[in-house]
A protein has these predicted regions:
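Extended repeat-based scaffolds of very large eukaryotic assembly and lipid-transport proteins
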Residues: 21-212, 216-246
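Inter-helical junctions in multi-pass inner-membrane proteins, predominant
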Residues: 248, 404-405, 409, 438-481, ...
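Single transmembrane alpha-helix segments in multi-pass membrane proteins
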Residues: 248-293, 323, 327-338, 477-483
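Membrane-embedded helix boundary and interhelical linker motif in transport proteins
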Residues: 279-323, 503
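Alpha-helical transmembrane segments within multi-pass membrane transporters and channels
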Residues: 303-346, 353, 488-493, 524-525
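Cytosolic-side transmembrane-helix boundaries in multi-pass membrane proteins
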Residues: 332, 338, 342, 357, ...
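Transmembrane helix-bundle core of multi-pass membrane transporters
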Residues: 339-407, 434-437, 511, 535-538
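Helix-loop-helix "hairpin" substructures at the membrane interface of multi-pass membrane proteins
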Residues: 383-459, 488
Length: 538
């Protein structure tokens, strides 16, 4: 009997031990329970939940931390659960935080963002960086390492060292080394040799935090360290100056492409036909407003609306240009003063018409996603995508117009009329028709320029006035009627403006460029690339 009792007691103890150990083998909390802990009013409880979420290993953990940081993680009062939210029509568009399933739309008061303080924000940033260090994507690991530059947190530095020991990607390893070397400069425990090695390694870095860390060692007691810091800062300054020059040149090319688009249509109407069209800026404005109207007609089509706006702007501005030539300009050939006054009056009419139709207020055009953002080459030099696209677009328009004038029947007739109008008429070319088509072509290209300008500035009735003078300067400087001269002049003036602006300011830079062109025209009245042969004789 005692043996049976002892055996039963032993089995009972084993069962109790097994039951006590079994919960330890299973997760004590699920991801849903962690999210529910964020409802607590205690910031300490939220800190624990954030830490658990970051270390959960769940594929949605990083996105949920980002949503919490951006105040997009909400408490839905109706269901009393944590959801994701996006602003929509004054309310919230709700989504499941894990599956991202649509949960419908609620009023603004029906859901409240989870509140966090600055301490929790820093905790999230640090945890995101630690999670990012173990991301399979090398670019994400590099970004995480870079985001930790300047940190003094021992746990984060330990995580960086652990990652560095097994990192096989060169760029990621370099980013981690930069962060660790910067930490060595801030550390009171690092010896002189360690700091000197760190300074040497950081001497080529362009990170602002690295520069600040180096400056913090300028008051070091060790002369060798001060000298090393000064040498490193000089190297950084030299590299920064080179990239700033490259940045200035890029903005100069960007301005040059805008001037090219604005002036290339004028190069046809003024250069080929000899017509001083003061309404050219308003034709650019019509192209910009066409872009605005297309986006209003297709409110959900911002990503492809430019593909519709470009031909639409060309046709609308070109049609208006043909009307101007047919009803006004054709009666004023050979009378430049009257032409100037008439086109100036047309420009005022177009401006007032736009004010009546669209109101005098500026209108904004939404930039497509594929034109937004920038190509970040390093911390001090980046190329914005919208300007890169506009440079490429300007060159495409230039080459297209060049092919039209050189390889098509219309181009042949335009060149014939521009060289000798009477002979062209004698050969059966209808010069009045060619005049209308040429004016329409130049006006259409002005409209296309307006599409590009709408991506850089607000669309308003006075948009064209900002470019009409610059357009005439480009055409005159490059050589009247010469497209290659227009290209060279546009980029030359654009780069010159941007090189002068840091020294003299934007207004004085334009004045200096204008004075230079006046002096240049005194020396070479026909511009950089004057017409030759019969066209020059005309």
């Amino acid at each position: 009997m005692l043996r049976v009792f002892a055996l039963a007691l032993a089995l009972l103890c084993l069962t109790s031990v097994a039951q006590a150990e079994s919960p330890a083998t299973e997760p004590t909390t699920t991801i849903e329970e962690v999210l529910q802990q964020l409802r607590s009013r205690s910031f300490d409880d939220k800190a624990a939940a954030i830490d658990a979420l970051a270390h959960s290993g769940h594929p949605r953990a990083d996105a949920l931390l980002k949503a919490l940081q951006d105040r997009r993680l909400l408490l839905d009062r109706a269901s009393d659960r944590i959801v994701l939210g996006e602003r929509a029509d004054g309310g919230w568009q709700l989504h499941d935080p894990l599956s991202e399933a649509d949960l419908g739309t609620v009023e603004s008061r029906a859901a409240a963002p989870i509140t966090i303080n600055n301490r929790l924000r820093r905790q999230i940033e640090n945890l995101q960086a630690v999670v990012g260090l173990n991301n399979p994507d090398a670019a994400q690991r590099r970004a995480a390492a870079t985001s930790l530059i300047g940190t003094k947190d021992p746990d984060l530095l330990a995580a960086l060292r652990e990652r560095r020991a097994r990192e096989d990607n060169t760029s990621v390893a370099a980013a981690i080394d930069t962060t660790l070397n910067t930490a060595a400069l801030y550390s009171e425990d690092s010896d002189l040799n360690t700091r000197l090695n760190a300074i040497e390694a950081l001497s080529g870095s362009l990170e602002p935090t690295v520069r600040n860390a180096l400056r913090s060692r300028l008051d070091s007691d060790a002369p060798s360290e001060r000298k090393a810091v000064e040498t490193a800062l000089k190297r950084i300054d030299a590299r920064t100056a080179r990239y700033q020059t490259a940045d200035t040149l890029f903005f100069g090319l960007s301005l040059g492409s805008v001037l090219l688009l604005a002036a290339i249509g004028l190069a046809i109407t003024f250069g080929v036909m000899g017509v001083i069209n003061m309404a050219h800026g308003e034709l650019i404005m019509l192209g910009a407003y066409t872009t605005f109207v297309v986006q209003q007609v297709f409110p959900q089509g911002h990503e492809w609306s430019l593909l519709v706006a470009i031909p639409a702007a060309f046709l609308i501005s070109g049609f208006v240009g043909v009307l101007i030539e047919r009803f006004v300009i054709r009666y004023l050939y050979g009378r430049p003063l009257e032409t100037l006054l008439a086109t100036f009056g047309i420009s005022l009419i177009l401006q007032q018409a736009v004010r009546v139709i669209f109101s005098p207020l500026n209108r904004s055009v939404v930039t497509p996603e594929w034109m937004s953002g920038a190509w970040q080459i390093n911390p001090v030099f980046s190329l914005t995508f919208n300007r890169l696209y506009i440079i490429a677009f300007a060159l495409t328009v230039f080459l297209g117009l060049l092919l039209v004038l050189k390889k098509t029947r219309l181009g042949l007739q335009v060149r014939a009329v521009s060289q000798n109008r009477q002979t062209a008429r004698g050969l059966g070319i209808r010069s009045d028709r060619i005049n209308a088509l040429t004016f329409g072509l130049g006006s259409g290209i002005a409209g296309v320029a307006g599409v590009a300008l709408a991506q850089l500035t607000n669309v308003g009735p006075n948009l064209g006035q900002a470019y009409i003078i610059d357009s005439f300067m480009v055409v005159v400087f490059g050589g009247v009627g010469n497209l290659w001269g227009t290209l060279t002049a546009a980029f030359s003036l654009g780069i010159a403006n941007k090189l002068l602006e840091p020294v003299s300011g934007a207004v004085l830079a334009k004045i200096f460029v204008l004075v230079f062109i006046i002096l240049f025209i005194q020396r070479k009245p026909r511009g950089l690339f004057p017409q030759r042969g019969r066209a020059a004789e005309e």
